[in-house]
């Protein structure tokens, strides 16, 4: 890939145009280092997608390839459908700090956000304990 001078606004526009064409994609977020303005050489563009139905692996690869060709940057795709159950903190961070690229169904997006929030609030006290204990060990040199 060549040196990339694409702006965040251009990434948002191009990614939205490409993803919106796929009938199986209901909504998508841009998240990660580009959104936080922490881009370094070699940073990839993180995109999270919610699918109407479970996509085939080849379909995901095709989406990733289409995005990489159009945006001229390495793409890291996250599938949102099962994220609240498997990684509630990441799901929460995506909807809280990410940029919504588009949605085709407001009610599905609203229900998804509700589910993410409930799962995150369920595990947050445990995450806080784990993080506090981890930091204590680091500070004590263990």
Q: Which stretches of residues belong to each language-model region?
A:
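Short beta-strand->loop micro-motif that forms the acidic, two-metal-ion catalytic signature
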Residues: 46-50
